Design a protein with these regions (language model features):
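Conserved short alpha-helical segments that host acidic/polar catalytic motifs at enzyme active sites
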Residues: 1-156
Length: 156
C-alpha cells in the first residue's frame, strides 16, 4: 500500500516529510522517494531500500525545500526499482500516485505521447507526461487536472 506526505510551508520541511514517511512504514513498501523545490528547481531522491537510506541521500546533498512531497510505493505497474519509484519527475512536473490507472495505454494514444519520452514501467508516468504537455497550453494547474481527470479510469 502506498503512502503520500506533502507539505508546503515557510521553512525547510524535508525532515517533516521523512518523519511522515517513517510513520507510514508499517504499511509496507518496496521503494520510496522525495521531491521538492530547491533554488527554484525541482529535485528528487529515490531509494529501493529503507527510508533511512533515502534520508542519508538527502542529507548528503544538503537540500532545503519548503514545498515537498514524499511517497512510499507498493508496485502495481512496473517492478520495484529506482526508475519506477515515485515521485515521477519531469521538467516542470512531479507526481505521486496511489492507485491504478486502468486506461494508461489508451491515454498514451489519446495524447499522442512519444514512446521515447517514457522512462518508467509505471502507469503514473503517463499523467506526468500529459501534464507537461498541457502546461504549454494552460497556465492554471487546476484546469489541467480537471481536463486529465475526465479521461482517467481507475482508482486514485
Amino acid at each position: 500500500m502506498c503512502g503520500i506526505v506533502g507539505i508546503a510551508s515557510k521553512k525547510n520541511n524535508l525532515n517533516d516529510i521523512l518523519n511522515g514517511l517513517k510513520s507510514l512504514e508499517y504499511r509496507g513498501y518496496d521503494s520510496c522517494g522525495v521531491a521538492g523545490v530547491s533554488d527554484e528547481k525541482i529535485f528528487f531522491e529515490k531509494s529501493i531500500s529503507k527510508i533511512y537510506e533515502l534520508e542519508k541521500k538527502i542529507n548528503k546533498r544538503k537540500i532545503q525545500s519548503n514545498l515537498s512531497i514524499g511517497h512510499t510505493r507498493w508496485a502495481t505497474h512496473g517492478k520495484p526499482s529506482i526508475k519506477n519509484a515515485h515521485p515521477i519527475t519531469k521538467e516542470k512536473c512531479t507526481i505521486v500516485h496511489n492507485g491504478i490507472i486502468e486506461n494508461f495505454e489508451e491515454l498514451k494514444i489519446k495524447y499522442k505521447i512519444d514512446k521515447k519520452l517514457i522512462i518508467t514501467d509505471t502507469d503514473t508516468e503517463i499523467i506526468s507526461l500529459i501534464i507537461e504537455r498541457l502546461l504549454k497550453k494552460y497556465d492554471d494547474p487546476s484546469i489541467i487536472i480537471k481536463k486529465i481527470a475526465k479521461h482517467i479510469k481507475g482508482t486514485y
